[in-house]
């Protein structure tokens, strides 16, 4: 069939078009061939018709017209091109043909010259056919040599293209690339290359063949991919080089460090070898031992103990330090001279001046104390030697010689006190007090050994009290037994020597009286009181340079603590306010007792305030007087204890400029006007609050009358300002106004603060010695859990000066301890000792049994609080004071106590508490404050359901127990829910079901109707005339408008109720009428349950209704 769209075609035979389907080898000649097609068709008509020969001739003529040779290798050169360049365009044209043959689908994108789209498609199809026809025979005729030549040409062309690509500066050739290398085509410009290319001539009327868009896109993508691969390869190469460089550097650094470490190790080894050669090398244990010894040495120095071997060294060091200080003083002066003196520098100068004065005062005090001690030692030795020479062996002679200076009887002495005091003063002038010799234990000499047998007698004379004359013969008899032979019958002759001996003892005791004088004062005991968190312990920490407060549980003091400050330390602290040194210290030191501030520890504050001679009441200047402050004021007023007020936390005043450990007046003068005004305002508020409590108060330096006005000392526990003023004021008041109460008494007074187990000493007791002297070997009696404890003192230990007695540390041993002092006593059998009890010393004439009874009376008063019924909780505490606080709390809560104990909790304590599981399970509880619970005891408690509550802070224990009691209450409430009957009165409206179950509509006339409320009706029996209570059962359902309800109250719309009853239920119409009023069936048990568990829920109107219903149901 002839192709469509061809005009002027006379021969429609399809065979005539066979020649046209064969495309020329050169695609560039396609356009001229297409243009000459009509002319060729006209000549065809004139040619003879001859079948195959005519067809061959026709093809040959066409080739001639196009200027093509029969040989495709030689005839591919287009017209107008040089024949020499024939092979190259021939190859490139062939290559272009091969590229286009693969992509048939892109042909529709090409644009035709003229005509519609269909005509264009037909022409393209014809061209494809021609190409197929031409290529097949041409490819078959290639010889081997031609193929080799073609291959070489292609290789040559490929090399040229690569060389052109490398030349980035020059333009690329416009030759068409092979399909295997589409990316190269993109870079070729349209300009002709030096080599001839098969480009069509514009005169021929044809157009240049374009590369399809999708091929260009693929080429671009391939080029981009190649570029990325190259970049990735370059980046990987750079990364590899960088890693190699880093590894090389790391290796160099490692080697350098190893070399440095080896060098350092070698250097240290050489240093150790050098020290070993010099004999100076110390191991770790030796260094620790040296540091420990140094600390002990410092503590001994702080206590005022001098070591002769170190005195010369200290002098040299002191001289060197003095020179160094002078140089240091000169340096800052030179720097300061040219500068302007501003406020900050004034503060620095004041602080430096205060420090220098304190150091100078401390050195002077130490030197003075040393000279006094040497002088006292020399005098003591001389007196001992004189005393030994003049010792009278005959007691009668001694008694006769002393009789001249003393009154005849104790009664006469008591009646004439003034005369007695004069005699004492005369005796004091004649001979110094022997007590002074007991301040420091001296090394034993031969003379001292001779005087030792007199010690028991001296002790006996100190402890002995004046007694009525009735007991004198008995005591004389008791004391005379070893000296004389006793007869079964008494006679006047026998009584004479006894009376004489009693007289001797009285006279022997008499010379010891001069000890009580104003120059021989004991250390005053000062108690710190105040509200919680006012800074009591922090104030002490600042004075003694410790950190006790932060180590306490919750930062709260819960036990009495004691700290001893020697006079040297007080002098050093007060040097800032005693610059001229005129103030003289007569007391040997100051013992400060720290008491808890919490509400529960009123008993400990009471015990602390009873021990003390003077008190410090700490008040927060920002808050004024608080509840426990007012309670402390009441305690002080009751005991008539003098006190000073520390207005603490002045550093919290806005804008306060601090100077560490300075006097208040100097610091206050440097503050600006606003701070001074604020201080004055707060001071006036505190004064007003004290006036409300009945106390006149004034600033300490403005106070002219200490008897009538309380002194207020502003202090800061953080900066230490005002503390020197406070210490000086306390010592001043003690020496001037309280000398009589600070004189030594022969009677020993001591209180046990705490019982502790100390490694190396066993169980020990902390004791506040407020009067008398304790010695090693003394027989003591104190209160124990299983009765009085009688034992001998094995060791007397005191903490280092200015260290808390409660805190573990290095202890100093003493042969004897003089009041007032906090002392730790080590003795056998102290395991059951009770903290807070009294400690008594058994004298030669004292009866141990009497002392036992006296000591045990403390514990009896405590056990009197224990419930006699045997039902109650068990309480275990660490000290007597804590136990008292717990018992007070439980008494306020109305909780009975069955057992009390002091110390750790063991299995026997838990077993004792387990008895409550049978008697009262709610009280099978142990409250343990600040004690350890044994592992076995805890296990036994868990197995048997006994609750053990432990806490280090007393309020946490209270909270735990309160929570437990609340849980028990809720449990009981749930159990007794069915017994609780809320009162209500119901008026029936309609009966829906008469029985089993009764369903009735009711109005609530009074009270409230709840589910499970028992309902009853009260009727009068017509025959007997008595009340009959008809029980209907319990309300199991309440509905209104078919909606269930839990409760229906008075005044709400009517509801339908269902009443069910197990067994036979009364029926409406037979036992009941619709008009009968219904009531909630109350009883005595239900009323008790309401009172116990629902008292806060039941309203006053409901209680009134219960009273009415009691008469209805005859409840008593």
From Swiss-Prot:
Its main location: cytoplasm. It is found in: Cytoplasm. Residues 648-651 are annotated as: G4. It comes from the Eukaryota. Its EC number is 3.6.5.3. Binds 1 monovalent cation per monomer in the active site, which can be sodium or potassium. This structural cofactor stabilizes the GTP-bound 'on' state, and may also act as a transition state stabilizer of the hydrolysis reaction. Residues 716-718 are annotated as: G5. The keyword GTP-binding applies. K(+) binds at residues 533, 555. Mg(2+) binds at residues 537, 557. It is an enzyme of class 3 (hydrolase). Residues 530-537 are annotated as: G1. Residues 521-742 form the tr-type G domain. Its cofactor is Na(+); K(+). This is Eukaryotic translation initiation factor 5B.
């Amino acid at each position: 069939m002839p192709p469509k769209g061809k005009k002027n075609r006379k021969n429609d035979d399809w065979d005539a078009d066979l020649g046209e389907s064969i495309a020329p080898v050169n695609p560039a000649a396609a356009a001229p061939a297409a243009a000459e097609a009509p002319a060729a068709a006209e000549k065809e008509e004139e040619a003879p018709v001859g079948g195959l020969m005519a067809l061959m001739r026709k093809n040959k003529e066409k080739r001639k017209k196009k200027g093509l040779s029969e040989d495709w290798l030689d005839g591919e050169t287009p017209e107008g091109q040089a024949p020499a360049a024939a092979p190259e365009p021939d190859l490139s044209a062939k290559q272009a043909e091969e590229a286009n043959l693969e992509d048939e689908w892109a042909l529709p994108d090409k644009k035709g010259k003229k005509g519609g789209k269909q005509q264009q498609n037909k022409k393209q199809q014809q061209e494809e056919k021609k190409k197929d026809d031409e290529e097949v025979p041409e490819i078959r005729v290639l010889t081997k040599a031609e193929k080799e030549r073609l291959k070489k040409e292609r290789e040559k062309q490929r090399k040229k293209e690569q060389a052109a690509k490398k030349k980035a500066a020059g333009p690329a050739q416009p030759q068409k690339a092979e399909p295997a290398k589409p990316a190269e085509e993109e870079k070729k410009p349209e300009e002709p290359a030096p080599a001839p290319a098969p480009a069509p001539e514009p005169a021929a009327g044809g157009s240049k063949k374009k590369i399809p868009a999708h091929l260009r896109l693929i080429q671009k993508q391939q080029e981009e991919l190649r570029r990325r691969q190259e970049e990735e390869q370059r980046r990987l190469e750079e990364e590899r080089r960088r890693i190699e460089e880093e590894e090389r550097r790391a290796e160099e650094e490692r080697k350098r460090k190893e070399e440095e470490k080896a060098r350092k190790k070698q250097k240290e080894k050489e240093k150790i070898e050098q020290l070993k050669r010099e004999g100076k090398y110390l191991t770790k244990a030796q260094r620790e031992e040296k540091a420990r010894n140094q600390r002990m040495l410092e503590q001994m120095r702080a206590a005022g103990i001098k070591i002769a071997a170190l005195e010369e060294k200290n002098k040299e060091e002191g001289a060197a330090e003095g020179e160094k200080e002078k140089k240091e003083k000169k340096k800052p002066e030179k720097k300061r001279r040219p500068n302007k003196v501003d406020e900050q520098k004034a503060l620095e100068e004041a602080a430096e001046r205060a420090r220098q004065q304190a150091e100078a005062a401390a050195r002077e005090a130490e030197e003075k104390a040393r000279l006094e001690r040497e002088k006292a030692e020399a005098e003591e030795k001389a007196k001992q030697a004189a005393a030994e020479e003049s010792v009278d062996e005959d007691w009668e002679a001694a008694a006769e010689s002393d009789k001249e200076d003393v009154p005849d009887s104790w009664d006469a002495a008591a009646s004439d006190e003034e005369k007695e005091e004069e005699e004492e003063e005369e005796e004091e002038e004649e001979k110094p007090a022997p007590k002074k010799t007991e301040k420091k234990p001296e090394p034993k000499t031969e003379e001292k050994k001779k005087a030792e047998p007199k010690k028991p007698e001296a002790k006996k004379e100190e402890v002995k009290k004046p007694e009525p004359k009735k007991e004198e013969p008995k005591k004389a008899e008791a004391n005379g037994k070893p000296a004389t032979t006793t007869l079964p019958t008494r006679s006047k002759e026998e009584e004479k020597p006894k009376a004489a001996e009693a007289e001797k003892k009285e006279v022997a005791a008499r010379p010891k009286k001069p000890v009580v004088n104003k120059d021989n004062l004991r250390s005053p005991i000062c108690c710190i009181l105040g509200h919680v968190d006012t800074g009591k312990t922090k104030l002490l920490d600042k004075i003694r340079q410790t950190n006790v407060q932060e180590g306490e549980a919750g930062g709260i003091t819960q036990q009495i603590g004691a700290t001893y400050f020697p006079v040297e330390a007080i002098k050093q602290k007060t040097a800032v306010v005693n610059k001229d040194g005129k103030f003289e210290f007569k007391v040997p030191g100051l013992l400060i007792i720290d008491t808890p501030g919490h509400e529960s520890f009123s008993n400990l504050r009471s015990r602390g305030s009873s021990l003390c001679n003077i008190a410090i009441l700490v008040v927060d200047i920002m808050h004024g007087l608080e509840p426990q402050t007012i309670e402390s004021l009441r305690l002080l007023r009751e005991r008539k204890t003098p006190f000073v007020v520390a207005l603490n936390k002045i550093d919290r005043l806005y804008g306060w400029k601090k100077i560490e450990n300075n006097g208040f007046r100097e610091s206050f003068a440097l503050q600006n006007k606003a701070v001074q005004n604020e201080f004055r305002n707060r001071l006036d508020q505190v004064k007003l609050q004290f006036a409300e409590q009945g106390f006149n108060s004034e600033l300490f330096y403005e106070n002219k009358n200490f008897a009538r006005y309380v002194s207020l000392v502003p202090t800061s526990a953080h900066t230490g300002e005002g503390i020197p003023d406070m210490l000086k004021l306390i010592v001043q008041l003690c020496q001037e106004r309280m000398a009589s109460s600070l004189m030594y008494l022969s009677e020993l007074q001591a209180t046990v603060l705490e019982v502790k187990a100390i490694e190396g000493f066993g169980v020990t007791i902390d004791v506040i010695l407020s009067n008398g002297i304790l010695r090693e070997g003394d027989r003591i009696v104190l209160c124990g859990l299983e009765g009085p404890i009688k034992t001998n003192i094995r060791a007397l230990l005191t903490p280092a000066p200015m260290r808390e007695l409660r805190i573990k540390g290095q202890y100093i041993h003493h042969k004897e301890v003089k009041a007032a002092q906090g002392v730790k006593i080590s003795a056998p059998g102290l395991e059951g000792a009770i903290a807070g009890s009294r400690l008594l010393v058994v004298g030669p004439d004292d009866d141990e049994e009497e002392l036992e009874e006296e000591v045990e009376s403390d514990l009896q008063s405590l056990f009197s609080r224990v419930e006699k019924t045997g039902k109650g909780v068990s309480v275990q505490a660490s000290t007597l004071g804590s136990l008292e606080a717990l018992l007070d709390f439980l008494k306020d809560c109305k909780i009975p106590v069955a057992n009390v104990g002091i110390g750790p909790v063991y299995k026997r304590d838990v077993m004792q508490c387990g008895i409550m599981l049978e008697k009262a399970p709610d009280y099978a509880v142990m409250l343990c404050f600040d004690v350890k619970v044994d592992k076995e005891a805890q296990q036994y408690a868990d197995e048997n359901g006994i609750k053990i509550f432990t806490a280090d802070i007393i309020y946490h224990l209270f909270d735990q127990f309160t929570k437990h009691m609340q849980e028990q209450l809720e449990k009981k409430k749930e159990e007794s829910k069915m017994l609780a009957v809320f009162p209500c009165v119901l008026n029936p409206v309609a009966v829906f079901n008469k029985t089993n179950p009764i369903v009735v509509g009711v109005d609530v006339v009074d009270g409230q109707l709840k589910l499970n409320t028992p309902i009853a009706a009260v009727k009068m029996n017509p025959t007997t005339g008595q009340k009959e209570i008809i029980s209907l059962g319990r309300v199991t359902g309440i509905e209104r408008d078919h909606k269930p309800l839990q409760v229906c109250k008075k005044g709400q719309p009517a509801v339908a109720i269902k009443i069910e009853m197990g067994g036979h239920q009364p029926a409406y119409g037979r036992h009941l009428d619709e008009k009968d009023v219904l009531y909630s069936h109350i009883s005595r048990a239900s009323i008790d349950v309401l009172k116990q568990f629902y008292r806060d829920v039941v309203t006053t109107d409901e209680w009134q209704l219960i009273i009415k219903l009691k008469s209805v149901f005859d409840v008593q």
